[in-house]
Amino acid sequence: MYCLQWLLPVLLIPKPLNPALWFSHSMFMGFYLLSFLLERKPCTICALVFLGALFLICYSCWGNCFLYHCSASELPEAAHDPAVVGT
């Protein structure tokens, strides 16, 4: 389970508030995970635990999934602030 210490913090990286940056963020995270899995080759148990956690986070649609934005979840309140979106 040593390899999980490099995978689990990835789930804690927040999604950007600006909706225009969601695609770039999801591409970066996807390429990071792919390169990590190819380079470090974590054990099967660690990979399954991480993919299970990622599936549960994305399936719950709490807005924490970095792969896509759930249509049922609302935007954060700060996303409607022009000072935040304009940055």
UniProtKB/Swiss-Prot annotation:
Keywords: Cytoplasm, Membrane, Nucleus, Transmembrane, Transmembrane helix, Tumor suppressor. It holds the Pfam family BC10. It comes from the Eukaryota. Its main location: cytoplasm. The chain crosses the membrane at residues 19-39, 43-63. InterPro entries: BCALP. It is a multi-pass membrane protein. GO terms for cellular component: cytoplasm; membrane; nucleus. It is found in: Cytoplasm; Nucleus; Membrane. Acts as a tumor suppressor; induces growth arrest at G(1)/S checkpoint and apoptosis via RB1-dependent and p53/TP53- and NF-kappa-B-independent mechanisms. Modulates expression of genes involved in the regulation of proliferation, cell cycle and apoptosis. Belongs to the BLCAP family. This is Apoptosis inducing factor BLCAP A. It comes from Xenopus laevis (African clawed frog).
